[in-house]
Design a protein with these regions (language model features):
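Catalytic-site microenvironment of enzymes
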Residues: 10-11, 16, 87, 94, ...
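N-terminal Lys/Arg-rich, disordered targeting/topogenic segments
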Residues: 1-11
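Hydrophobic membrane-insertion alpha-helices, especially the h-region
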Residues: 15-28
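Active-site-adjacent loops and short helices of periplasmic peptidoglycan-processing enzymes
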Residues: 37-220, 229-230, 297
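Penicillin-recognizing serine hydrolase domain
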Residues: 13, 34, 39-45, 68-82, ...
Length: 337
């Protein structure tokens, strides 16, 4: 009897242990199954694995840069020593010749003067009075002038058009004084703006472009400058004006009638199939003849900068050639130059 009870006890203990083992195994299985069922990328307090981690390396496509054609390298197509052609609408470079080599910009400098003037917030009817002390240095150096006289009071608007249409050094000197108090301070302002625009091979020492060893730029930088200038409606209005009459003064009772030098120069060189808009000429003995201009075709604006021409007509002829070469010219982003 006792032996039978002992056997039953052993069997019961064995069954109990087996049941416990089965329960523990089932629990382990369920936990493992739940872990397997967790979707990839679920937030578990760590970094979710990427789907690409499970893809063999050779099957993951490598990122590729889009092919960007180099700009057309100009040579005998033009006579000027420097050139840069840009699509102003998207900043793509179409063609260039020594575009990043330093040269003297002459009166193309006045584009920066115009830009800073238009950004100054000075009202167009703000008056300015000339004196002989500021005019004498310009006369001595043979700078181009509007013709304003000692004691003559004109407006800020008169100075804007006077600096561009006839390329008046008297107008740019006056703008520098109105904006920054004196021309040297204004030149520093010009240089800060140049750096901000990415004109890293440019340095200005005056507002008009009179020759100085430390007054230089590149065709590329001038193209960047003109591109920025065209973003301002007032700048564009001044650059495209064919004629302007200054305020009536006691020195000039009927005002001074100013005509666009660019329009006069380009009259015999207007390109086909594109509408020439305007720009800025330049000349010194060191710079040669220069022209920064822009034209439009089907809503797209193109910029052509040419410099270092030997004759007055040279940059105009080259600009005509380049505008007519625009169709089919490969493009490259100006920021990658």
């Amino acid at each position: 009897m006792e032996e039978r009870k002992s056997k039953r006890g052993k069997i019961g203990l064995t069954v109990f242990l087996l049941v416990d083992l089965l329960l523990i195994g089932a629990a382990v299985y369920m936990i493992a199954a739940r872990q397997r069922d967790i979707p990839t990328g679920a937030p578990l307090g760590g970094t979710a694995a990427s789907v690409l981690d499970s893809v063999p390396e050779e099957t993951v496509p490598a990122a590729t840069e889009p092919d960007v054609p180099a700009p057309l390298e100009l040579a005998d197509e033009i006579e000027c020593g420097y050139a840069y052609v840009v699509n102003a609408s998207d900043g793509l470079v179409l063609a260039e010749k020594n575009g990043e080599e330093r040269m003297y910009p002459a009166s193309m400098t006045k584009l920066m003067t115009l830009l800073l003037a238009c950004e100054s917030g000075i009202e167009p009817d703000e008056p300015f009075t000339f004196d002989q002390d500021m005019l004498d240095p310009l006369i001595e150096r043979g700078a181009s002038r509007v013709g304003f006289e000692d004691g003559e009071t004109v407006t800020f608007g008169d100075l804007l058009y006077g600096s561009v249409l006839p390329s008046g050094g008297d107008a740019t000197a006056a703008l520098a004084i109105m904006i920054d108090g004196d021309e040297q301070t204004f030149a520093n302002h010009m240089n800060r703006k140049a750096q901000a625009l990415g004109m890293f091979d440019t340095h200005f020492s005056n507002a008009s472009g009179l020759h100085a060893e430390d007054h230089y730029s590149t065709a590329r930088d001038i193209a960047l400058l003109l591109q920025e200038t065209l973003k301002h409606d007032l700048c564009r209005t001044v650059l495209t004006a064919p004629v302007y009459t200054t305020s009536r003064t006691s020195q000039h009772p009927n005002g001074l009638e100013l005509y666009s030098v660019v329009d006069q120069r380009m009259a015999g060189f207007l390109p086909q199939h594109i509408v020439f808009q305007g720009g800025k000429t330049g000349f010194t003995d060191y710079a040669g003849y220069c022209l920064a201009s822009f034209a439009e075709q089907e809503g797209t604006t193109y910029i052509v900068v040419v410099a270092g021409g030997e004759e007055k007509e040279t940059p105009c002829r080259d600009a005509q050639t380049l505008y007519e070469l625009l169709c089919g010219v490969p493009e490259q982003n100006v920021g990658e130059q």
